[in-house]
UniProtKB/Swiss-Prot annotation:
Compartments (UniProt record): Membrane
Name this polypeptide is given: Uncoordinated protein 58
Pfam families the record matches: Ion_trans_2
Underlying gene: unc-58
Biological processes per GO annotation: locomotion; muscle contraction; parturition; potassium ion transmembrane transport; regulation of muscle contraction
InterPro entries with a match to the protein in the record: 2pore_dom_K_chnl, K_chnl_dom
Membrane-spanning segments: 184-204, 289-309, 318-338, 400-420, 428-448, 453-473
UniProt keywords, alphabetically: Glycoprotein, Ion channel, Ion transport, Membrane, Transmembrane, Transmembrane helix, Transport
Protein's organism: Caenorhabditis elegans
Topology versus the membrane: Multi-pass membrane protein
Phenotype upon loss of function: Worms exhibit defects in mobility. Mutation causes a dumpy (dpy) phenotype thought to be due to hyper-activation of body-wall muscle. Severe mutations cause paralysis thought to be a result of fully contracted muscles.
Residues bearing carbohydrate: 226
Functional description taken from the UniProt entry: Has a role in mobility, possibly in the transport of potassium in muscles.
Family affiliation: Belongs to the two pore domain potassium channel (TC 1.A.1.8) family.
Amino acid sequence: MFFYSPNVAPQPSSTSHRRPTLTHQHHLHVGHLDTRLSVQIPEILSRSLVHDPERTRLVPEQLRFIIDENQELWTGSQPPTGFLELCASPVSSVFSNADARRMSQRKLVLRRPTISIQEDGKIIIDHVTARWEGANINSQSALLDADDGATVITDTIKDDQDDKEPKSCPQQTVKYIKILTPHVILVSVLIGYLCLGAWILMLLETRTELLARSKKLVRLTNLMSNFTAESWKMLNNAQHGVSNMDEGEWAATFREWMVRVSETVDDRRPIRRELNRPDDLSNMHNKWTFPTAILYVLTVLTTCGYGEVSVDTDVGKVFSVAFALVGIPLMFITAADIGKFLSETLLQFVSFWNRSVRKVKQWMSRIRHGRRKSLQSTGGPNDTLDILGVDGTEEKLWFPIGAYVSCICIYCSIGSAMFITWERTWSFIHAFHFGFNLIVTVGLGDIVVTDYIFLSLIVAFVIVGLSVVTMCVDLASTHLKAYFTRIHYFGRAKRFLGMSEELKEIVALLGAMRRKKGGKVTWNDVRDFLDNELRDRPFEPHELLMKLRFIDETSSGMSTIRHNSFQSDFFRESEYIRRVAALRPEQPAYL
């Protein structure tokens, strides 16, 4: 333990550091950890007092009581009354909760973060500086830096507190609104982006499309006139004096047949009305309507094709490329976000179903055997064990690959039932094929949509369908990765598969040594590391935290710092580096 007495003259530079303490809450049962300190003991490593009064406060009465019980550690009969404790966050962080659950369902290990305050007011928080008995740090948390650890632990604390504190209906409503707001904004931005792109393409492509169609109709009219005149001449020469057919009558009959042929070739256009005024653009049928433009930009973002319309102008082509560069990531981010919600909902439903089935089986077993068995309560201190199995281990939900295929097929079937209500001429198979092509980004074909409700349904079907596909891929990724690994390593040795935590730590250690050296790590480097870190490591008694001792700031005092703790900015000061270099001249950079 390191304490600072205000009677010592302050030095020009000042930095305070606090190591973790174990908190014994009165409402928690910590088992064999009862013998540890039952109060929060501050440890301050400092060469001088922090001058800012806002950063310090008096040591609590509990600490004074503990000090009274350890009067033999003091030179006088009474402990000094001017001790100061570094102000830290009053919130204790849950550390390695999963490990504590495996030991006992009623054990919970709490620890406080390490907090360092610099002269400029910067606060450095380190959550991974100590290993407590029964709650070891895993390899992933050990590789986190201080900022990442602080973020993870802080989020966990906030979630736990939110779950425990009862909230009123307005508070719950505000909470859900805050959760839904960014996702609603994301979907709204995507829909607005689609509408903006459709409107811009309509402005760019409408006149070009109408002019091209007008020229086509003028050519068709001239062709029909020339063919009529030439045919009449041929017919008149062939039947000179034999037939009494009038020219106008013959032209009208022949023109009608040609119009019918044109309507057969282009059955989606009102060609009979357009032929009456081929030079009038307002009389032309425009295929760049808002529904077709929406479908086109939708196919651009979903990387599928649409055969009804295409971009012809150079400006429109450039705009389509720029629109796709921004819109494609936006589309897939939105689909991934919705898919994540769907996957979490599905996992929660399956987890709830499994718990319900397990409880029903336990209840039936009690009735069958005629004896009462205590079941896990749904309230109280075991709320955190809802997602755990009977043995206290976390359940791993598994779905066969066929379940994901069935999910996509069911969604396409629902869409086909919706499509055939709007397109009466479609069969179920045709509608199913159309919906499947939409969500797997094959293409829209050459469908022409005139109803805005049907258009909205298609857009919603595509966005939600991509989310469903993303959800299925997200849930099946673990199994697909396992199958791919088996295929990839078929007939070969599987390297680094099923690696234990110890091996992973060794690999991480070698990586840190390689980054420090800047080249290949040799056996001599590993041997030097083992000699410096294992042979020269000072001994730390197991009951170190159970005793209160004064240790002045000498090299031996600094050696009690745990060798595996991350260095905060306090440890990077020149004075400390000099002192540590004297103890461990070849200390690795990652320590």
